[in-house]
Amino acid sequence: MTGKTFTAILAGAVGALMLTGAALADPAQSKALVDAAKSRGDVGEQYDGYLGFVKPASDAALKAAVAEINAGRAQLYREAAARNNVTPEAAGISAFKTVVQAKLAPGEYYKTPEGAWVKK
């Protein structure tokens, strides 16, 4: 499979995951918690394709929502990697570059490969 095809498949899958909150017990509530935290600058998107905490979190519900979303993304990246003969890490990075970064709203944070949080 070509890199372009892999990117297209991964982009569609990640987009669906971001919209549905796949594998979450209460996707709407978890997505709402994470979206609010992203708006406040508490949670951001990392270069590896996972959510991360820009600021230390004390809210157990938010921590659980981030962990659940990241678990869903990890499963997606493993599946995409197996189908496309790449590592899950490469799939996560590709998802960030092709889908996640483009969906960041102004004011939201993302983490660079060097580890710095940057406000969009």
Predicted regions and their residues:
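Short, well-ordered alpha-helical segments
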Residues: 66-81
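Bacterial N-terminal signal peptides that target proteins for export
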Residues: 1-10
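Short amphipathic alpha-helical segments, especially helix-boundary/capping motifs
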Residues: 10, 52-55, 69-72
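Amphipathic, charged alpha-helical segments and their helix-to-coil junctions
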Residues: 27-64, 83-84, 88-120
